[in-house]
């Protein structure tokens, strides 16, 4: 199973101060997630709706954390995760996959990806992110 070191940035920054990029093709989810995370003190540096726009946003905003929807319509969230990993960023952003589907539906794919893990969209919160990242 591929592993990814949590970025040095995450060791220095409180979870509520993380700079987050949201990658999802649902405008409604992006708006709701932004409000939820910003109300907890996180900074949302942008949103993206596709693999190409996600890579552009990662390179231009340098987020500490990227939340990636597994189903992006024409693109796969797993492809986004691997494309981010291929950028060889230092430090690399932490990547968390999100979905409305159950974690069990994607467990093997999540475990074999370079993402830190999975969160259900219904359980998304700053506390859940903090728990998943172990910070």
Give the location of each predicted region.
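Short hydrophobic/Thr-rich beta-strand motif most characteristic of the beta2 strand and flanking loop
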Residues: 41-49, 57
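Acidic catalytic/metal-coordinating carboxylates
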Residues: 50-53, 76-79
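The feature encodes the CheY-like receiver
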Residues: 73
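Non-catalytic signal-transmission and effector/linker regions of two-component phosphorelay proteins
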Residues: 1-19, 29, 124-135
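Conserved acidic segment of CheY-like receiver
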Residues: 17-28, 33-37
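As written
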Residues: 77, 109-117
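Active-site T/S-Asp motif of two-component receiver
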Residues: 66-69
């Amino acid at each position: 199973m591929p592993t990814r070191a949590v970025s040095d940035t995450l060791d220095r920054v409180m979870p509520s101060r993380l700079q987050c990029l949201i990658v999802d093709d649902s405008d409604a989810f992006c708006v709701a997630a932004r409000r939820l995370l910003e109300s907890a003190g996180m900074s949302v540096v942008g949103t993206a709706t596709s693999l190409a726009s996600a890579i552009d946003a990662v390179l231009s905003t340098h987020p500490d954390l990227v939340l990636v929807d597994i189903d992006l319509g024409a693109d796969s969230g797993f492809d986004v995760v691997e494309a981010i990993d291929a950028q060889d960023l230092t430090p690399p952003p932490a990547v968390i996959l999100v979905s409305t589907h159950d974690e069990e539906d994607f467990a093997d794919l999540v475990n074999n990806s370079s993402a830190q893990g999975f969160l259900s969209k219904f359980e998304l919160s700053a506390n859940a992110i903090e728990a998943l990242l172990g910070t």
